[in-house]
From Swiss-Prot:
Listed InterPro entries: Ribosomal_eS1, Ribosomal_eS1_arc
UniProt keyword terms in alphabetical order: Ribonucleoprotein, Ribosomal protein
Key word Chaperone present: no
Family: Belongs to the eukaryotic ribosomal protein eS1 family.
GO molecular function terms noted in the UniProt entry: structural constituent of ribosome
Protein name according to UniProt: Small ribosomal subunit protein eS1
Amino acid sequence: MAYNKKYADWKRKIWFTIKAPAIFNEVELGETPAYKPEQVIGRRVELNMALVTNNYQLQNYKGIFKITKVEGTTAKTELEGIKMYESIIQKWVEPGRDKITDSFVIKDKDNRLVRVKPVLITNRRLHRKQGTAIRNIWRNYFVELGKKLSFEDMVMKILNKEIPEQLKIQIKKIYPPLFFAIRQFYLEPREKHILLIE
């Protein structure tokens, strides 16, 4: 049989098992091949949170995990963020309704930068002052929450709907939402030039 360099090189690769962080019980996220352990560091994997947690109620979100350490053939990860599937949000968008989005950065209690992207949909167009008031509600809420909780703690409270439910109570005072969610929540690289909300 003719020598196939590509096949021979592939056979020399090692398969590393990717594990979730401790907050998700270090469940297996998949596998990734590499020649050396250091080649695995920095790789990312995105996976539906229902598969990560074995909880189908979290199927609207995907988690982003980054490999930060390798022990033997086990690649350990840290959570970089969660993102809601855009199709979930689009189901609520109809003519005559209003969609309010926002994007801002806060600090968590460990001084890490966190990007927060809420989305709100109402059954009619809101006045500009109402939109501004609603944005102020969730911005102030997350600034104060970040002083008390870590990024991971806030992620868990988003997934279990504690944070969205608390915010909906406050938002209703301005206008009742048809749909409200934290569509994206992730760690922001410090090297980027950003405007921090404090």
